[in-house]
Amino acid sequence: MRSFISILFSIFFSNLIAQSITQNPLSYFGIGEQNFGSNAIYDALGRNSVNYYDSSQLNIFNPASYSSMSSGNTLLTIGLNGRLSKFSELNNDALRITIMPDQFALGFKLSKQIGAAFGLKPYSRRGYDITEYDSINLLINKYEGSGGTQAFFLGAGFRIFKLNTSNLSFGFNANYIFGSVTNTRNSKLFSTINSTPAGISNSTIKLNAINIDLGISFEQIISKNHSVILTGAFTPNLLSQNLKISEGLFYANSSSAGVIYDTINYNVVSSSINNSALKFGLSYRINLKSWQRNMRFINPSILFLGSYSTMKTNFSTSSNEMNQISFGIQFAPETKIFENNINLKLLEKINYRIGFYKQQNSINAISNLNYNDLGFTFGLGIPIIIQQSLSSFNASFSFGNCNAKNSSSLSEKYFGINFGFVFSPAKFDRWFRKRKLD
């Protein structure tokens, strides 16, 4: 098990530090493409990330959830996702495949009322490859974007109070953000046979920053079979930041030693970015009546989720605002898996998930760009019950269409797949257990 986890971590880390981990031309703007958080569990539920958690999973997007982890169980979560996109603009189409890491996080209980977690997750990413034929200036321009920023986080969740029917929790994540993104343009004349660019201009943004995520959760048990959870998460503007923009312009100078690029202009300036996010969520759980199947009883439940998220980014000459609504449903044929594991069939152990989301993305740069992203999702959660371990394998699939209001602008149709693993030691093999020696 531990060697398998090491292999997954190596795959995750190698993808995280890769130069290009997205293929979206809109990542040209700002510090790259950002989102509200990705995970195989939450993506399958229509991207509901702030309002779903239990003792068998680690929700790093709402740190208040850390207090709900079960005592004595350590949770390690790793995620990877892929995306097949078809971009269209006027009469031009292009297919792109992207593989991106989700997160690498470890969570554990410090006491009955306090849980903690730390890990690594993407913050922004840039990646595109566009060729332009300029017939007026007789130039071939190739635009490329690469790089990404990551966030290392350390957080804790506290149960403020717990009554017979009520539970209030609060949590925070402290994040250290680091990394860089680059825009590059290579230019050469139509008449040039040599593939070496005659001129190169690039702009690199390097960011080191600190910020904090705040989360809150209130659970109310209405009756034996009904409960509701209200959640919220807020990320204020960066508390501290060091942002540098390096811009250079170079031209090719041929010599006997080969092509040498001379610097025409190079400049480094300091800048700043404002980035904040807010999420609200609600979940409603209903424990259904027990079903009898072939002299066996199973205890099903259904969970309804809805959330609203907004993110605002202001940077240099561009700004971006994203708003998203999400809906999801999860059906669990059996809620008492550990107690009835021996009598359950495989399909009765799986959690079934479906969802829908709509995201509006407004980019104000050289011109105003307004995109609507609509998608449908579904997925499965398969518990790995070995000696009462909380481990599980989760998968989600999404179909979406991202269009601008202007029909001649760039559009995207995509299919996404997301895999996530939650690892937890078996009951007899605690990773952080105090041992006594006789």
Tell where the protein language model's regions lie, with residue ranges.
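Bacterial Sec-dependent N-terminal signal peptides
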Residues: M1-Q23, F118
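Subset of outer-membrane beta-barrel
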Residues: Q19-D438
